[in-house]
Amino acid sequence: MSCRSLSKEELARVFSVVLTEQPDEVNLSVHDVVAMGRMPYTGFFGNLGKDDEAMVERALRLTGMSAFASRGISTLSDGERQKVMIARAIAQHTPVMLLDEPTAFLDYESKKTTMAMLHAIATDMDKLVVVSTHDIDIALRHADRFVTIGGDGLRDLAKADVERMTGAMG
């Protein structure tokens, strides 16, 4: 089946997306932002049922953000906001998560923690987690497969191939 044949609603049940740019949801709590991930199942008005609420709570717990649930999103650090956006993607409950530079604004320890969390999500929840990054060191520590984009198009590489390439670059 081609993605082109899917409606927006169907796409939202297959792909969850975390972008580099984080929206300023000034008047929303962390819980409300994560609950937005349930929109493909609850509709525009977002009336959460018991199962939806359980998915939101699970996503908050998995990302370590449960204690922040009632806080306003605008009061959080960049790293905390990134965890909220990842929690929203988890709550969306899709088989594929796409993340654009999820460690872009994070310190080194937070980068490692975030990538380890994403790897655990892929493994424990049987999801395809696709991360775009320029941080080869972090990717080498946590990724199972690599796809590079260059003048010759897409290349699917094993970890050893990437290590050889980066070793040759110095």
Where are these regions (language model features)?
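H-loop/switch region of ABC-family ATPase nucleotide-binding domains
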Residues: 133-134
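ABC ATPase NBD Q-loop/coupling interface
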Residues: 1-10
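Conserved ABC ATPase "signature" region
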Residues: 35, 50-68
